[in-house]
């Protein structure tokens, strides 16, 4: 089980990323637009640097919804590999069966 503080930190990052998503996308588009002047692009880059560090969506980490484990998380289920195995064997995940060929 992950520490509660680590899970809370991830939730904080999600909230910040959602809050600044529009501004982040706008500045990112301006900075990448080759048709704009160098001054505008530099100003956009400075604007990106002034945003909070945790507002960057790449800093988010997928975690298991049950255990908070950061590695081995399947996006489709939002669960770690160990919990997927447990729940699948118990029949709690619809449509998931043990492979046999």
Curated annotation (Swiss-Prot):
Pfam families: Ribosomal_S14 (PF00253). InterPro entries: Ribosomal_uS14 (IPR001209), Ribosomal_uS14_bac/plastid (IPR023036). GO terms for molecular function: rRNA binding; structural constituent of ribosome. GO terms for cellular component: cytoplasm; small ribosomal subunit. One of its GO terms (biological process) is translation. Keywords: Ribonucleoprotein, Ribosomal protein, RNA-binding, rRNA-binding. HAMAP family: Ribosomal_uS14_1. Binds 16S rRNA, required for the assembly of 30S particles and may also be responsible for determining the conformation of the 16S rRNA at the A site. Belongs to the universal ribosomal protein uS14 family. Part of the 30S ribosomal subunit. Contacts proteins S3 and S10. This is Small ribosomal subunit protein uS14. The gene is rpsN.
């Amino acid at each position: 089980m992950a520490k509660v503080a680590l899970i809370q930190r991830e939730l904080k990052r999600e909230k910040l990323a959602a809050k600044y998503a529009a501004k982040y996308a706008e500045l990112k588009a301006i900075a990448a637009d080759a048709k704009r002047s160098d001054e505008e692009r530099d100003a956009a880059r400075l604007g990106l640097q002034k945003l909070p560090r945790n507002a960057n969506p790449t800093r988010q980490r997928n975690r298991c919804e049950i255990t908070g484990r950061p590695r081995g998380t399947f996006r489709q289920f939002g669960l770690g590999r160990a919990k997927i195995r447990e729940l699948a064997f118990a029949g709690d995940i619809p449509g998931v069966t043990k492979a046999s060929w």
